[in-house]
Amino acid sequence: IRLPKFYNAQKTVLMEEYKNSFLHLDLQKWQLKKEISLVYNELNYFNEKKKLLKKADSIFTQYFNRADLRLKKGESNLLEKATAENLRSQAEMQLKSLEKDREISIQKLSFLINDGTFYQNENAKYGILNLENLNAEYAGNPLVLKQLEQEKNIQNAKLLAEKAKLSPSLNLGVNSMTMKGNGADEKYYNATHRFQSGFVGVGIPVFNSAQKSVIEAQKVNQLIAENNYQLGLINLKNQYLQNLRQFQKLNDEISYYQKTGLQNSESILKTANNQYFNGEINYLEWTLLVTQAFEIQNKYIDRLKETNDKIIEINSLKSE
């Protein structure tokens, strides 16, 4: 029979592991929430890209129809029509590819939520998400740190449990036997007589070098858990700072596009169309200008997605 200290130590290990299982579940929920947010942002991004590609497809289709008409009238050559057809075909292929990517993201969203319902994102205006208050003295994600702290508690409890195995044990026993024949007292005993005896002893571990080695190994596990906590904290702080710096860089680009870039792209697009239809520029100049205008709008949408991804990462690192 072990002393209560031994059983209490074993119970503590089980209780700490039990607590850790709930923290693991909370971590999975936390990670799932971030993944859903990233996929949802991706779907909104695809919607915005689709609008831009449809706009480009419409303009390139008009250009193709005009080039085809000019060719029939002998006002242009085959190269202009081929260029127009190529631009229109590229826009169509990009739309089809985008739709496939969007279907994959929709399936991923439904898979992550996993409640048997098919989900899609709302067709809302695409803009920058809300960023929670920034804290220069970021101290790490509470949920992740709790789990790392709990790992330390488990290893501490296991060390105490291994040490408890060196504690003495109580040995209790009862013997019951029969004897047939003459006993030491020269009396005759038949098989119906039973003789009982008992013993009480204390077991003290003497050859315990193996267990002491186990204890030393557990001390190493204890140090590993402590190091993992410190490394986890450093990693969280580095992630936060990296995402914050990338967000600030992207936010500067977004400001440029919103204040200047988008207005310039619309101005280029409008002016290029007017000059081309009035015969002031040729189709090569028009193609260059229109492509440049759409590239500005395309980059703006890309930067919006990247900025929102960083906001999701930053908010997630601060939330539980």
Say what each PLM segment does.
Residues 2-32, 54, 79, 83, ...:
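Sec/SRP-type N-terminal targeting helices
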Residues 9, 122-124, 182-188, 217:
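Outer-membrane beta-barrel translocator domains and adjoining extracellular loop/strand segments
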Residues 1-3, 139-213, 238, 316:
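A small-residue-enriched
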Residues 90-115, 264-320:
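Short segments within alpha-helical structural elements
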Residues 10, 17, 21-24, 35, ...:
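Charged, solvent-exposed faces of alpha-helical coiled-coils
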Residues 5-8, 47, 71, 75, ...:
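Residues at alpha-helix boundaries and short interhelical turns
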Residues 29-146, 243, 250, 293:
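Periplasmic alpha-helical coiled-coil/stalk elements that build and connect Gram-negative outer-membrane
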